Design a protein with these regions (language model features):
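Conserved small/polar residues in nucleotide/adenosyl-binding loops
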Residues: 1-7, 255-260
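Boundary at the C-terminal end of the N-terminal hydrophobic targeting segment
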Residues: 13-15
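Conserved SGNH/GDSL esterase-like catalytic core that processes O-acyl groups on lipids
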Residues: 18-24, 29-118, 154
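Catalytic His-Asp segment of secreted/periplasmic serine-dependent ester chemistry enzymes
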Residues: 35, 138-215
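Active-site segments of SGNH/GDSL-like serine hydrolases
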Residues: 95-101, 122-157
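Generic structural signal for well-ordered alpha-helices
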Residues: 117-121, 160
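Short, compositionally biased P/S/T/A/G/V-rich stretches that sit at domain boundaries
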Residues: 213-227
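Ser/Thr-rich low-complexity repeats and stalk/linker segments
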Residues: 224-257
Length: 260
């Protein structure tokens, strides 16, 4: 009996050691500020439930932090950053930039944003040479935010473009927290922080990016069987499918397969 218990303990410990480690890097939105129970409702906590026991998801969010190293609270100067580096995640998900819209930060230091983001990415690559890094387009800021028209709206847009440039320069995976939340400003309880439903949407976005499971083929209702196409006019047909799925598009004269 003792041997069985010992073997079971060793097997359990081995399974824990072999789990894929996911580090969630960010500010108060990642931390779960404003949620009734951040330990179960933050997006990293909900992501853990979605991914299951073969993954270990850790929340390294720090409220008020900036991506900018000259910002009012740089993420790379926080204990959470040092713990994330020590964690050595196999997957690192970064959502930073919301607090950089502060008038203390973006107007004076915007030219450092791309450089500082690349430095952050490089530090995680140094901690784990095989790390898979995802950086996120920013969650929305609702128009009821007190600084929305005095600069925040425009700076938020500029930061989105900078994040897209970082993804291109570094070759990391770009994910989008903005598009799925934008139609629902009411779930941004204080114009910035998502409620539990919003955190679920963020977790679902990361889950799909990690696993390639997007819930099967999804296309706009604009595209239907037997639809009429205008001749001699280019038509872009787009949608979402699970990673690796091949989709067939057929017209009267042609049949095309998407690339795997």
């Amino acid at each position: 009996r003792q041997m069985c218990i010992r073997d079971r303990f060793i097997t359990t410990a081995s399974a824990q050691e072999n789990r894929i480690k996911v580090a969630c890097i960010g500010n108060s939105i990642t931390y779960g500020y404003g949620l009734p129970d951040r330990t179960t409702q933050s997006y990293p906590a909900q992501l853990q439930k979605m991914l299951g026991e073969s993954y270990q998801v850790e929340n390294f969010g720090k409220s008020g932090t900036t991506l900018l190293n000259k910002g009012h609270r740089p993420y790379m100067q926080q204990d959470e950053y040092r713990r994330a580096i020590d964690f050595g995640g196999d997957i690192v998900v970064i959502h930073l930039g919301i607090n950089d819209t502060d008038p203390r930060d973006w107007p004076d230091y915007r030219d450092f944003f791309v450089k500082d983001y690349i430095e952050l990415i490089d530090s995680f690559r140094a901690a784990n040479s095989k790390v898979r890094i995802m950086i996120a387009r920013l969650t929305p800021i609702a128009d009821r935010h007190p600084r929305f028209l005095s600069g925040t709206r425009d700076w938020h847009g500029e930061i989105q473009l900078a994040i897209e440039n970082v993804a291109r320069y570094t070759g990391v995976q770009l994910i989008d927290f903005h598009e799925p939340l934008y139609p629902y400003p009411f779930i941004l309880t204080d114009a910035v922080h998502p409620d539990p439903e919003g955190a679920f949407i963020m977790a679902q976005t990361v889950y799909s990016a990690i696993t390639g499971d997007y819930g099967g083929l999804k296309m706009s209702l604009l595209y239907t069987d037997n639809m009429v196409l205008q001749r001699d006019v280019p038509l872009t047909v787009q949608g979402i499918a699970n990673a690796g799925d091949r989709v067939t598009v057929s017209t009267v004269s042609y049949t095309h397969l998407t690339l795997p």
